Structures are given as structure tokens and as C-alpha cells.
Amino acid sequence: MKKTSLFFVSVLLMAFVATAQAQQFDAALGFGTVKAPAASNNGTNSFPSLSGGLYTTFSGDILFWHHLGFGGEVSPRWSQSTYGGVVNNFGIVQKYRPIFYDFNAVYGRNFQKKFGADVMAGIGGEDLRFYQPVYTCNLTCTNYVSSNHFAGHIGADLRFYFWGHAFIRPEAHYYIVHNNQEFNNVNPSRFTISIGYSFMPGF
């Protein structure tokens, strides 16, 4: 996935800078799910729910000054889901995959030796990929059509350091998605548990 590859490159760049001059750099891999209102029908159109599914999250953040910094994350759904009972132009049930991504200002603190916490706010997007049984080729070949929506994002987490600088981190995220007409609600929540490592001076 292009967004995932771009995010990995960004994380590597942040890690390089962090080891040189930052207070702290965190990198993590997480698994979680999305919660949103149930599907609805207004008599004319049916609106599926975004709830459910396993999401993989790749995240990184870097703190520079007075516990302030920036970070980013990308969260694709692990498997394709069925878009309600909609049948596409090829006569088969429509499959789709959501991808959430965001870039944030971050405030993070460590408490004693075992705990830390972060709060964040920023912008990002929701990339909805609707899959087709054939590939379309331009500069690259893909078998999906994307519907992209701008999103605001807020989130918070709690880090527990279980071994040195390695941590487990429960997280909660809230997205305000603009013009998310494909689904029943524009504001899904994402809940994740991540495992990661904090790179600090002297690690």
C-alpha cells in the first residue's frame, strides 16, 4: 500500500532525527478495531456501519521541546469487508477496505519509570477502497477505486513499560470525517493496543 510505505519512510526519517537531537522517539505496531453506529435505512438509501474488523496500526511520534512534538499513524483494515448487500457492476457483492491515517501535534509525558501518556490532535483522512474483479492500469495497476475524505483527529494513550524502554499502549482515537456519505456516521472511533519501543538519549 502506498500510504503504508510512505509512512514507513517517514518513521525511518523521524528515527534518524530523533537519535540525534530529540527528547524521545516512539515507534509501535498495534491491533484494534473501529466502533461506529449501526447501519441504517432512510427508505431510499441504505447506509452500512463502519464498525468491526481487525485494524493494524503503524505509528511513530517524536518529542522535541518541553514534551511537545509531532507524530503520525496509518491504520488499514486487515481484510476486505462486504459493503452491505450492494452488488457492483460485475454482478458480485461489493468489497471494500477502509484506511485511516493522521498527522498530529503530540504532548507526551513519562511518569516515574513504568508509565507514560500522550494526547494528540491533528488532521488526516479516510481512504475507502472499493475492490473490482479486474485491474485498471495507468502509471500503476490497481483493482480498486478510492473514495478519500478529509478528517480531523484527536487521540490519547497510556504507555506501560514492561521491559526497559519497551511498552504496551492502549489507545483511543476519534475521527471527524468530512462528507462521509458512504456510511451511517461521519465520526467513527478507533481502539487499539500497541506494542512499541521508546528511543531516548542514552538508550
Place the predicted regions along the sequence by residue:
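Cleavable N-terminal export/targeting peptides
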Residues: 1-24, 202-203
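Short glycine/proline-enriched turn or capping motifs at secondary-structure junctions
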Residues: 4-6, 183-195
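Gram-negative (and chloroplast) outer-membrane scaffold detector with strong preference
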Residues: 31-37, 56-139, 149, 160-162, ...
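Extracellular loop and loop/strand-boundary signature of outer-membrane beta-barrel proteins
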Residues: 41-47, 86-94, 137-144, 179-184
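Short catalytic helix/loop segments, enriched in acidic residues and glycine
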Residues: 48-57
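Polyanion-binding surface elements
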Residues: 157
